[in-house]
Amino acid sequence: MLTEYKYLYETHMHTSNSSACGSNTGVEMAKAAKEKGYAGIFITDHNWYGNNCINPNLEWKEWVHQFCEGYRLAKAWGDENDFDVFFGYEAGYNGTEFLIYGVDEKWLVSHKEIKDASVEEQYRLIHEAGGMVIHAHPYREEDYIPEVRLFPEYVDGVEAINATHSNKLSKSHNNPNFDTLAIKYGKKYSFPMTAGSDVHSTTLFGGGVAFKTKLNSVKDYCERILSKRDYALTNGEYTITIEELENKQLSN
């Protein structure tokens, strides 16, 4: 880690409270992240059309309440232990996924239309709420992803580094070229670029976005990313500043 970027945040994390693929609860993930040296985490569980474990037959308000449980309990633990826990979620569209930041449980309850929103409508709704849409691992290839689909007009940025693709601790999705292609995509459209580990258990990779100063809120995170202000990205093994990444020459 570049020493001046000492506040590291995990921006892509799942819990067993809401994600069917999660192995540990939000509280367990928060504890592990604090022990790992993170300044904070964003819990981004899979939403209603992603790999979710909440009963789909629940009334919307109750569904959202249960969906946010991993975050809510982790946040309570974080508040008691001087550790930042922020809310986000990963929206699924038949394998294509987006990281959503800047809305909360109250917003979700009052905007049921987000449930069946198209990618375009999602972008509009999240923007109206002051939030941010990041295309997660846009070039990942897996059985659950029928095809690579890009929506440059309906995202604010791209997850350029996903630690599951390259960190030696990762047991799935191992292909650094997924990140190389994502970086090229981000550079082509001059998108803000982020990094995250996409972790599902307390075996943490150490990936994420690092800043010189602590984040004040999710809004603060969105503003820093969207303005491409001074920050660094890491997969847990190597670290690069956003300025260096934007200027990095990649082979064809």
Where are these regions (language model features)?
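Well-ordered, non-membrane alpha-helical segments in soluble/globular domains
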Residues: K61-A74, K115-E120, H173-T180
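Conserved beta-strand positions in the central sheet of alpha/beta enzyme cores
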Residues: F42-I43, I134-H135, E159
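Flexible loop residues that form catalytic
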Residues: H46, P138, A163
